């Protein structure tokens, strides 16, 4: 397990803005899958993550490499009724305390299936997720 909470070039955990990045390193073997999560901060309970299966880190025994953003989905956790992104009074940083929004149905679902009347950005306009295999000593 790895945590990515310290921006590249920073000395301590912090949020990032446009153009900044987080990095983390993991060790994996064929058959390993990756799952990551990151909250869509200007929401009640939305988060980014791959599908339930995770992202396969190897294909035909070789590590994958490159942009995997297309495998990251915006999900609704189902814990609070959604308010308009970036405006709702029960969203960080405007909420007075954690968990102040009205309870929802508790069902996690892809935001594309949620009929709340709001528009959400495409994942690729919010983040880019890339995989870069480490160089193995002695490998060509």
Locations of the language-model features?
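A structural detector for beta-sheet-dominated domains
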Residues: 27-29, 58, 73-75, 130-134
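Ser/Thr- (and often Asn-) enriched beta-sheet segments in non-cytosolic proteins
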Residues: 21-25, 65, 71, 126-132
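Activation corresponds to long, low-complexity, non-globular regions
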Residues: 78-140
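Structured domain cores in non-transmembrane regions
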Residues: 1-52, 56-57
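An exposed acidic His-Trp-rich patch
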Residues: 44-94
């Amino acid at each position: 397990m790895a945590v990515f909470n310290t921006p590249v070039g920073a000395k301590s955990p912090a949020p990032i803005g446009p153009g900044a990045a987080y990095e983390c390193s993991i060790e994996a073997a064929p058959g390993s899958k990756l799952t990551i999560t990151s909250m869509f901060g200007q929401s009640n309970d939305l988060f980014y993550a791959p599908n339930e299966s995770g992202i396969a880190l190897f294909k035909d025994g070789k590590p994958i490499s490159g942009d995997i953003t297309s495998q990251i989905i915006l999900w609704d956790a189902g814990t609070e009724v959604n308010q308009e992104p970036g405006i709702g009074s029960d969203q960080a940083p405007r909420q007075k305390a954690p968990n102040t929004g009205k309870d929802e149905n508790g069902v996690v679902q892809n935001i594309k299936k949620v009929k709340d009347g709001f528009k959400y950005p495409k994942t690729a306009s919010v983040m880019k997720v890339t995989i870069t295999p480490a160089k193995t000593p002695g490998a060509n």
